[in-house]
């Protein structure tokens, strides 16, 4: 699920899949856990960083709820890039930012080639990054199982975030659809190099 529309359809898509008995049997035969990938890079290119991050957050909540409803464990594979615009950034912060109840002792994410040397090129730095990822996973799995705020506060916050994401999406799409922007971008940057 990589584009904004894909992320928005994650709930209906998973519900439809899990309603098909042969598909459920396949999940059972493969260990009983469904893996679902959420894409950071394409959703960011499609909708801008604010909308992308918010739609990913909502998709993760939908995944959690569907897993709870169906009893099928869902492992989320985070398709993150190296830069902030592609979902990159500190791994531990990304893990801790997951909605409550999403992580259950496991997480899967990509580390792009451009950050491998930075994060794992020296044994001490590699140990530190793995330590931070592991402790974040433990904290998110054990301490973030239930909401940290009351339902009214969460509902109000989600409403504000929906409005912000909608406004950000409209602004971003107006910008990237500006006539001549692609020509200007390709002639004024080294994108073709």
Residue ranges and their predicted role:
Residues 1-25:
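Carboxylate/His-rich catalytic cores and anion/metal-binding grooves
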Residues 13-20, 53-62:
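Well-ordered, non-membrane alpha-helical segments in soluble/globular domains
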């Amino acid at each position: 699920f990589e584009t904004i529309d894909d992320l928005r359809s994650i709930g209906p898509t998973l519900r439809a899949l899990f309603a098909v008995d042969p598909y459920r049997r396949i999940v059972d035969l493969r260990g009983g856990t469904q893996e679902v990938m959420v894409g950071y890079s394409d959703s960011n290119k499609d909708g801008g960083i604010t909308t992308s991050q918010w739609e990913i957050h909502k998709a993760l909540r939908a995944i959690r709820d569907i897993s709870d409803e169906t009893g099928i464990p869902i492992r989320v594979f985070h398709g993150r890039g190296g830069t902030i615009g592609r979902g990159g950034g500190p791994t531990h912060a990304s893990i801790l930012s997951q909605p409550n109840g999403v992580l259950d002792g496991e997480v899967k994410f990509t580390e792009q080639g451009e950050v491998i040397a930075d994060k794992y090129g020296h044994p001490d730095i590699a140990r530190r990054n793995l330590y931070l990822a592991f402790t974040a996973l433990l904290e998110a799995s054990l301490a973030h199982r239930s909401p940290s705020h009351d339902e009214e506060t969460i509902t109000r916050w989600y409403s504000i975030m929906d409005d912000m994401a909608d406004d950000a999406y409209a602004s971003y799409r107006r910008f990237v659809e500006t006539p001549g922007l692609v020509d200007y971008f390709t002639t004024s940057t080294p994108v073709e190099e």
